[in-house]
Every structure is written in structure tokens, then in C-alpha cells.
Regions:
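Membrane-embedded transmembrane alpha-helical bundles that form the catalytic cores
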Residues: 2-216
Length: 217
């Protein structure tokens, strides 16, 4: 149906609106501050060009990431309890997973807290967990991915590979935003299923978008 095929387009424009509102809302006071000789911290660094979720969070809401790193990640990962956990993991799990188990757990906790920071309800907690699970998994599987790239002779310096990684990251971010839009957790899967079943990408170019409330100027 038309309403069903609108789901991903509305979601796409929500992502664009979110970035423009958030980045623009920060860039305006930064620009005004520079008129008075005050250099405020950069908060966004072209996140649309990120090639991984980790890279995305280095570029998106940079001041929040820096605060979480200094006041959550380091205190947790360098605590005595996590030191013991790290030694236990090295002994009982072994391998790469054992070496980075404690660090990965601390990373997961950070993104869980980022979810709560955005809003103390299931939508934002699920959003934080989505990012935490994927980033933690990427840490644990990093060496496996490197072996696959070597076996497939992937040139990770090529423009094609960078485009692929950028689009893949954008897709993961796009899916994650469904959690913050759905009224209930079950609705997330309903929206995703609708997106897959009724994509109709041609509507991005055939003028249908104007019917969503956009006006030509």
C-alpha cells in the first residue's frame, strides 16, 4: 500500500531532519561565539561519511562521546573490578576474545548509558543497545574480518570499498533510528518488515515525495 511504502521514506527524512536540526542548532551558537573570539568545541564532523559505527560515533555528538569516554569508559575499564574481570577472561576464555572481553563489556555499558541519556524509556535504551551490540561485536570479530579481507584480496584503500563501508554504516544507523521512532518494541519489527516488503525506491524520484508535505520553492 501507499502508506506502507511511505515508512522508509519518512524514516529517511527523519534522519536528515535530526542531523540538520541537531548539527545546525550547534553550528549557529558556534558561529556566533566565534564572532566574539570564543572557539567552542566541534560537535559534528560529517558523520554521513563514517565508514563504521565506531567512526560514526567519533563524528556524531563529539562532546557527548568525549564525556562518556572520560567519565564512564575509562573509570569502568580501569577499575579494580574490571581489572580482575580482564584477568579472568584471559585465563578462562583466552584468545582475542579473552584479551578484549572487559574492554568490550565497558564499551557495551557506555552505549547502554548513551541510550538512557537520550531518554529513559525503552525506545532510547533499545537504540543504545543496538549500537552497543554492533560495536562490541565488531571489536570481538575484528581479526576475523581482517582474515576475510585478506582471503578475498579486498583493497580497503579503494574508493569502491570506502563507498561500500559508508553505505553499510548508513544502513546500520538508519535501522537504529527505527527504535527511536516506534511507539513499542514490537512496532520496530513491523516497520522494518514493511520497509523490506514495500520499498518502492522509484518514489524517491518520481515526484511522490511532494505528497508527504514537502513543497517546491
Amino acid at each position: 500500500s501507499s502508506a506502507a511504502s511511505d515508512v522508509y521514506k519518512r524514516q529517511l527524512f527523519y534522519c536528515i531532519q535530526l542531523y540538520c536540526d541537531f548539527s545546525g542548532g550547534i553550528d549557529i551558537p558556534r558561529g556566533v561565539a566565534r564572532l566574539f573570539g570564543i572557539d567552542m568545541a566541534e560537535n559534528f564532523r560529517r558523520p554521513i561519511f563514517a565508514t563504521s559505527l565506531t567512526d560514526y560515533w567519533r563524528r556524531w555528538h563529539i562532546t557527548l562521546g568525549a564525556w562518556m569516554r572520560d567519565y564512564v569508559f575509562y573509570p569502568i575499564s580501569l577499575s579494580r573490578g574490571f581489572g580482575k574481570l580482564s584477568r579472568w577472561a584471559r585465563t578462562h576464555i583466552g584468545g582475542t576474545a579473552g584479551k578484549i572481553f572487559a574492554t568490550s563489556l565497558a564499551t557495551f555499558i557506555v552505549y547502554f548509558i548513551i541510550g538512557i541519556w537520550h531518554g529513559a524509556n525503552f525506545r532510547y535504551i533499545a537504540f543504545g543497545l543496538w549500537n552497543g551490540v554492533l560495536i562490541t561485536a565488531s571489536l570481538l570479530l575484528e581479526k576475523t574480518f581482517l582474515r576475510w579481507k585478506a582471503a578475498l584480496h579486498v583493497n580497503d584503500k579503494s574508493a569502491g570499498w570506502r563507498v561500500f563501508m559508508t553505505l553499510r554504516t548508513a544502513l546500520l544507523v538508519f535501522i537504529g533510528r527505527y527504535f527511536t521512532r516506534a511507539p513499542r518494541l514490537r512496532s520496530v519489527f513491523t516497520l522494518l518488515k514493511t520497509t523490506v516488503r514495500h520499498p518502492q525506491p522509484v518514489q524517491l524520484f518520481d515526484g511522490t515525495l511532494w505528497s508527504l508535505g514537502l513543497a517546491k520553492t
